[in-house]
Amino acid sequence: MSDIALTVSVLALVAVVGLWIGNIKIRGVGLGIGGVLFGGIFIGHFAEQLGITLSAEMLHFIQEFGLILFVYTIGIQVGPGFFASLRVSGLRLNLFALGIVVMGGVVTAILHKLFEIPLPVVLGIFSGAVTNTPALGAGQQILRDLGIAPDVVDQMGMSYAMAYPFGICGILLTMWLVRVLFRINVDDEAKKHESAITNGHALIKTINIRVENPNLSNMAIQDVPILNSISIICSRLKRGDMLMVPSPGTVIQIGDLLHLVGQPGDLHSAQLVIGQEVETSLSTRGTDMRVERVVVTNEQVLGKKIRDLQVKERYDVVISRLNRAGVELVASPDASLQFGDILNLVGRPSSIDAVADMVGNAQQKLQQVQMLPVFIGIGLGVLLGSIPLYVPGFPVALKLGLAGGPLIMALILGRIGCIGKLYWFMPPSANLALRELGIVLFLSVVGLKSGGDFIDTLAHGEGISWIGYGFFITAVPLLTIGILARIFTNMNYLTLCGMLAGSMTDPPALAFANNLHATSGAAALSYATVYPLVMFLRIITPQLLAVLFWGMG
């Protein structure tokens, strides 16, 4: 059998064994994708014993390409929400997550100096303790840039494997300790979160208002400031028994019923100006109008503003809402369309069909992957990661590397959405498939490289000590920030658990947090809020630690 065929066969075996290990759950918690690492260690140990030699060049390529696929698809997935998560609504969560990352780096530095842990080993322990695989890849790359021998760099993968399972356990233990320490009732926390969501967040609502203000009589909608704003859409007007789609030039009269779409605060302001809310239905049932949702798939309209489509002037149709990545938004005239946006249309059937044809509404396109933008994005990401950043006093230039470059580029491209006919939307199923493939390839190679000496290190070497160091790196920041967040901000427990899981970018921990209350989405929401920033910081941190430790000797 050729070297290539042998290497591919062994990698396939590692993936099968590793994914099987990851599916084994104890009390609902398993290693998940991390099981592939231990599958690689298991197969790597026996390959060493049997004298099986694999292609080193091929393994290196597969490891790096797998990492690129993984971080790029993560960036494309979270890109649309990344910059929004940095705004005020998520600022507090991101600050606490930042504190966890920084404190983890400080604990790592202290352990490195106190116990004189070798640089590759301590970076591997750090990456495993925070259960972040891209951090492992970034750390290995900077060590190679520093000129450290490949066999020494591979120690990082072995120490990562030692610390990884106890990193997961440390997160779960922290969640349990915070719950016990503050005597938290999970059901009460879920109710509090639901109440906060209902009362505090600006959700899209609708209201029917009768025009009673005499000052508005015979005024065009575009001349009424509250109605001619980007925060409210008037999608229907009923006059007597006639239901119509109003245009900016439509003249309103006393007694008209208006169907408004917007955020609760804006709708309340409109009610104060226009008149009283009424229970009268403005449903399209029994009329020649209908409401329909269509999806934007036509490359010709990507990047265009809603006002530029002129759907009211050309088709007598109103776009009342815009759904982007699961978030309902007011269809502001200045909003630019992105691939996959869902538009809520109100109008006559024939007119809606015409608008649907204009924007595409080809559901099958949502399941297709445009591969050209994928490789353009990966190529640009690799170039970005290769740009050296020279810092005075540092022995080598810092780089975003093959982990950071594609991630940052994907975040930017995911936020932009499209450039001309190129769109970076990726169907969730395709994104997940590429992401899982990438991480399986990466972890398989890391496990294979670590497997030869893993058992000896655990049984006769310093493996137990490495596990202890890793537990400190995991537990100290999580417990400290978890307790401070609960005491000083009274953070909701489910939100706190999601933030802790997100600060470690740990899906098994998120699964555990979600299972604390099956119907609450609090944990998932906070996890998603901190995940993009933390993933970036986790990739940069081992590089900074490596250069600092190297410089200090």
UniProtKB/Swiss-Prot annotation:
GO biological process: potassium ion transport
Keywords: Cell membrane, Membrane, Repeat, Transmembrane, Transmembrane helix, Transport
Annotated RCK C-terminal domain residues: 191-276, 279-361
Subcellular localization: Cell membrane
Gene Ontology CC, one term: plasma membrane
Any GO MF annotation of the entry: monoatomic cation transmembrane transporter activity
Membrane disposition: Multi-pass membrane protein
Transmembrane segments: 4-24, 28-48, 65-85, 95-115, 158-178, 371-391, 403-425, 439-459, 464-484, 493-513, 533-553
InterPro entries from the UniProt entry: AAE_transporter (IPR050144), RCK_C (IPR006037), RCK_C_sf (IPR036721), Transpt_YidE_put (IPR023018), YidE_YbjL (IPR006512)
Source organism superkingdom: Bacteria
Record family assignment: Belongs to the AAE transporter (TC 2.A.81) family. YidE subfamily.
Name of the protein this chain belongs to: Putative transport protein Ent638_0015
